[in-house]
C-alpha cells in the first residue's frame, strides 16, 4: 500500500494495531525516551503521545520501531520484499547495456518509471497552513525531546534537512540532529563529508560571507523520510526515489523565504539560514552507540520562519544502545543493500549488519569462494563500494554454507576456519565515525577484516577438515518415525 502523507500511514498502522495512542500526559523530558525504549525492545507499536506534558502538539515516536513498519513505509508488505527495491536500485546504479532491441524495449519501462517520478511543484500546501515569523518563532513552544539525563539539551532528531549547492538543480536531503540552543537557534550536526555540509562548503566558496539557506521538514510522508536514508544513485533525487516507492510524484512547495522546495505534506517546516562563522559546541548527547559522545563544533542554523499544518504532529525519536530506531532501520535496509552488493560482487551469498554492531560497524559476508585470496578482495570491495560502509570497522567473510545471520554459526566458522595472523587484514589511517571514541584520532582509525572461509591450496599447507554432517538418507529415515518418539 502507498501513502500520500504521514497521516494516511498512521491511519493504516492504527487499523492494523501497529499504532497506540497515549492519552496519559508523558513528559518530553526523559520520560518519552523511557516509554519508547521499553516499547521498542518489546517489538511494540508506534506511539502517538496525544497530550505531552506542557504542550498542545502531539508527539509521534517509534514510527519505524520494527522492520515490518519500515517495509510498510517503503510500500512493501514484508521485509523480504525490500530485496526488490534493492534490485531496482542496483539496476539504476549500474544499468546493463541491452543485448538487443528486445532487451532495450524491456528495460524501457524501468527508465520511464524514473522519468515519470520527477517531483511536482504545487502552489498551496498543508505544511504552510500556518506561518510563524520573526520574534514569534520560539522552539520552546514545541515538544522537543530531551532524551537522556546527560544530554546537553533538547534535540530535534527526525529532521529532514534540505539544502542545495550553488548552480545545482538537485537538492540534497539528509537527516541531521539539531541541538536547540535558543528560541530560534539550533546546532546543525552534519559531518564534513555529508551532502548538507558539502553544499554549505561549496556555497561559502562561491559566495563568501553570504548566509546559506536551509529548510528542515518534520513529519514528511514515509517514502520521503526513508528515501533520505536509502543508498539512492547520485543521478536520482531522493524526491524522485520517494515517488518510485509511493507510486506517485512527490509534491513539493517552495519555501516562503528561499527557493528551496520541501515536501508539501510535511507536518512542520523550519526555514532559515546558516551564517558563515556562526558556530557552537554541540553535545554531549547519547548516540546510537549507547554512549555519550564528545563535544564538537558545528554550524548554527538560525530559524527565520516556521510553517506547519493547522494541527501539526511532531515526529521524534531517540538514539541509544541498540536496539533503537536507527538500529531497526539498519536491520530493514540491510535487505536493500544485498542486491546492490551482489550487482558488483555476484559471488556474495548474503550480507548482514548485526544491530548490536550499531548497524554499520560490523558486517558479516558469506560468499561462494572461487580462488585463494577471494575473501580479502570482497572485504576490500565492501569497504570501498558504498559510502554507507566507509565507517564499518570489522568485516567477517565466510563461506556460503554459513548463515550470516546466525551468530553461533559465524563464531563456529571464525574459530575453525581462520588463523589470527594469516587471516586478519588491517587497514590503518582510514575514515572512522567521529562518534567512535575508541579510535585513536577523531575521525581516523583502523579497520579489520577476518577471513573465515575454508582455505584453498596456496593459503595453507595443511589438510583441510571436512565438516561432519549426517547423510540425507539417514535424515529421511529418522524423519519418517520422528513423531512417534514424542520428543517434540
Swiss-Prot record:
Pfam families: UbiD (PF01977), UbiD_C (PF20696), UbiD_N (PF20695). The keyword RNA-binding does not apply. Binds 1 prenylated FMN per subunit. It is an enzyme of class 4 (lyase). One of its GO terms (biological process) is ubiquinone biosynthetic process. It comes from the Bacteria. GO terms for molecular function: 3-octaprenyl-4-hydroxybenzoate carboxy-lyase activity; metal ion binding. Pathway: Cofactor biosynthesis; ubiquinone biosynthesis. InterPro entries: UbiD (IPR002830), UbiD-like_C (IPR049381), UbiD-like_N (IPR049383), UbiD_bacteria (IPR023677), UbiD_Rift_dom (IPR048304). GO terms for cellular component: cytosol; plasma membrane. Its cofactor is prenylated FMN; Mn(2+). Keywords: Cell membrane, Decarboxylase, Flavoprotein, FMN, Lyase, Manganese, Membrane, Metal-binding, Ubiquinone biosynthesis. Gene3D superfamilies: Single helix bin, UbiD C-terminal domain-like. The active site is at residue 287. It catalyses: a 4-hydroxy-3-(all-trans-polyprenyl)benzoate + H(+) = a 2-(all-trans-polyprenyl)phenol + CO2. Mn(2+) binds at residues 172, 238. Prenylated FMN binds at residues 175-177, 189-191, 194-195. It is found in: Cell membrane. Homohexamer. Belongs to the UbiD family. Catalyzes the decarboxylation of 3-octaprenyl-4-hydroxy benzoate to 2-octaprenylphenol, an intermediate step in ubiquinone biosynthesis. NCBIfam families: PRK10922.1, UbiD family decarboxylase. This is 3-octaprenyl-4-hydroxybenzoate carboxy-lyase. It comes from Halorhodospira halophila (strain DSM 244 / SL1) (Ectothiorhodospira halophila (strain DSM 244 / SL1)). The lineage of its organism: Bacteria, Pseudomonadati, Pseudomonadota, Gammaproteobacteria, Chromatiales. The gene is ubiD.
Amino acid at each position: 500500500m502507498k501513502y500520500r502523507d504521514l497521516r494516511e500511514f498512521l491511519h493504516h498502522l492504527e487499523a492494523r494495531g501497529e499504532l497506540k495512542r497515549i492519552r496519559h500526559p508523558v513528559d518530553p523530558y526523559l520520560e518519552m525516551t523511557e516509554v519508547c525504549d521499553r516499547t521498542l525492545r518489546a517489538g511494540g507499536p508506534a506511539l502517538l503521545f496525544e497530550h505531552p506534558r506542557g504542550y498542545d502538539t502531539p508527539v509521534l515516536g517509534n514510527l519505524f520501531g520494527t522492520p515490518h513498519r519500515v517495509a510498510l513505509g517503503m510500500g512493501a508488505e514484508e521485509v523480504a520484499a525490500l530485496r526488490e527495491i534493492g534490485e531496482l536500485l542496483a539496476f539504476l546504479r549500474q544499468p546493463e547495456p541491452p543485448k538487443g532491441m528486445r532487451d532495450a524495449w524491456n528495460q524501457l519501462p524501468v527508465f520511464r518509471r524514473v522519468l515519470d517520478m520527477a517531483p511536482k511543484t504545487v502552489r498551496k500546501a498543508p505544511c504552510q497552513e500556518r506561518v510563524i515569523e520573526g520574534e514569534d518563532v520560539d522552539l520552546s513552544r514545541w515538544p522537543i525531546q530531551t532524551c537522556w539525563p546527560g544530554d546537553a539539551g533538547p534535540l530535534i532528531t527526525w529532521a529532514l534537512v534540505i539544502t542545495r549547492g550553488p548552480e545545482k538543480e538537485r537538492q540534497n536531503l539528509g537527516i541531521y540532529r539539531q541541538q536547540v540552543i535558543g528560541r530560534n537557534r539550533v546546532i546543525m550536526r552534519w559531518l564534513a563529508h555529508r551532502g548538507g555540509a558539502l553544499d554549505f562548503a561549496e556555497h561559502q566558496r562561491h559566495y563568501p560571507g553570504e548566509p546559506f539557506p536551509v529548510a528542515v521538514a518534520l513529519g514528511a510522508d514515509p517514502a520521503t523520510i526513508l528515501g533520505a536514508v536509502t543508498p539512492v544513485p547520485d543521478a536520482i533525487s531522493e524526491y524522485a526515489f520517494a515517488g518510485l516507492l509511493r507510486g506517485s510524484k512527490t509534491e513539493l512547495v517552495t519555501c516562503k523565504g528561499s527557493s528551496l522546495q520541501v515536501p508539501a505534506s510535511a507536518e512542520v517546516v523550519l526555514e532559515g539560514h546558516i551564517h558563515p562563522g556562526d558556530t557552537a559546541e554541540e553535545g554531549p548527547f547519547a548516540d546510537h552507540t549507547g554512549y555519550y559522545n564528545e563535544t564538537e563544533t558545528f554550524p548554527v542554523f538560525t530559524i527565520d520562519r516556521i510553517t506547519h499544518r493547522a494541527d501539526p504532529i511532531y515526529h521524534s525519536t531517540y538514539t541509544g544502545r541498540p536496539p533503537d530506531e536507527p538500529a531497526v532501520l539498519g536491520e530493514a535496509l540491510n535487505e536493500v543493500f544485498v542486491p546492490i552488493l551482489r550487482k558488483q560482487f555476484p559471488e556474495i551469498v548474503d550480507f548482514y549488519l548485526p544491530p548490536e554492531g550499531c548497524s554499520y560497524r560490523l558486517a558479516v559476508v558469506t560468499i561462494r569462494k572461487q580462488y585463494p585470496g577471494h575473501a580479502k578482495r570482497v572485504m576490500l570491495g565492501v569497504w570501498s563500494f558504498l559510502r554507507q560502509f566507509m565507517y564499518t570497522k570489522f568485516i567477517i567473510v565466510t563461506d556460503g554454507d554459513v548463515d550470516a545471520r546466525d551468530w553461533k554459526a559465524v563464531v563456529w566458522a571464525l574459530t575453525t576456519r581462520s588463523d589470527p595472523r594469516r587471516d586478519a587484514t588491517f587497514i590503518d589511517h582510514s575514515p572512522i565515525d567521529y562518534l567512535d571514541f575508541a579510535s585513536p584520532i577523531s575521525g581516523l582509525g583502523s579497520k579489520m577484516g577476518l577471513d573465515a572461509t575454508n582455505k584453498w591450496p596456496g593459503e595453507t599447507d595443511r589438510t583441510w577438515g571436512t565438516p561432519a554432517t549426517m547423510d540425507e538418507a539417514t535424515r529421511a529415515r529418522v524423519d519418517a518415525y520422528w513423531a512417534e518418539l514424542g520428543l517434540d
